[in-house]
Amino acid sequence: MAGHSKWANIKHKKAAADAKRGKIWTRLIKEITVAARLGGGDVDSNPRLRLAIDKGTDANMPKDNIQRAIQRGVGGLEGAHYEEIRYEGYGISGAAIIVDCMTDNRTRTVAEVRHAFDKHGGNMGTQGSVAFMFDHVGQFIFAPGTPEDKLMDAALEAGAEDVVTNDDGSIEVLCPPNDFAKVKAALEGAGFKAELAEVIMKPQTEVEFTGDDAAKMQKLLDALENLDDVQEVYTNAVIGE
């Protein structure tokens, strides 16, 4: 099954992450801390914590930082108490945007998110206003040139729900979020290492932006991504090259 071009977006996302690795670490420390607080410090019984630690390892985060974050989460060390908040809104031409945050100050966070929307031509929506346009899924992106038939066999055997070959040759594997850790381990055991592996809010349909609208939309997304309390930004907008 064919899909949109993903590879350029994946490379852009990885380059952006490399450029602000310190910020990525801060976000991952929050995620590890909250995952440990909610589900305990044992990765075998806490798949969310396992995923967060895997992301930390992939981002070259020192093991000491990871362990301290776990200890803070389970109460072994003092630290800020973070809560998870989701905001929803609209960008240029009504594009749907979800903003997932972790914060120790809800008032500050909502003001900053609202300001970013307002400044860049978007607007905040109410809870549930756009979330229904997205599916909660595990996603793996494999580089162009990955053996499609072998990957499909391994993915479906591992419990994946769908395997999508994109226009640019990259391959996308989707699975239920609760099966993410199992599918990831099975794929890696079969010799397939994803360029990007995460649990996301995936848009059911996408809207492509080009020209000035693409530039405006990218500025809004960047403004939201750059807020300290923001963990993830999801959108149904595809920014054309």
UniProtKB/Swiss-Prot annotation:
One of its GO terms (molecular function) is DNA binding. InterPro entries: Integrase-like_N, TACO1_YebC-like_2nd/3rd_dom, TACO1_YebC_N, Transcrip_reg_TACO1-like, Transcrip_reg_TACO1-like_dom3, YebC-like. Keywords: Cytoplasm, DNA-binding, Transcription, Transcription regulation. The keyword Metal-binding does not apply. GO terms for cellular component: cytosol. GO terms for biological process: regulation of DNA-templated transcription. Its main location: cytoplasm. The keyword DNA-binding applies. It is found in: Cytoplasm. Belongs to the TACO1 family. This is Probable transcriptional regulatory protein RSc2190. It comes from Ralstonia nicotianae (strain ATCC BAA-1114 / GMI1000) (Ralstonia solanacearum).
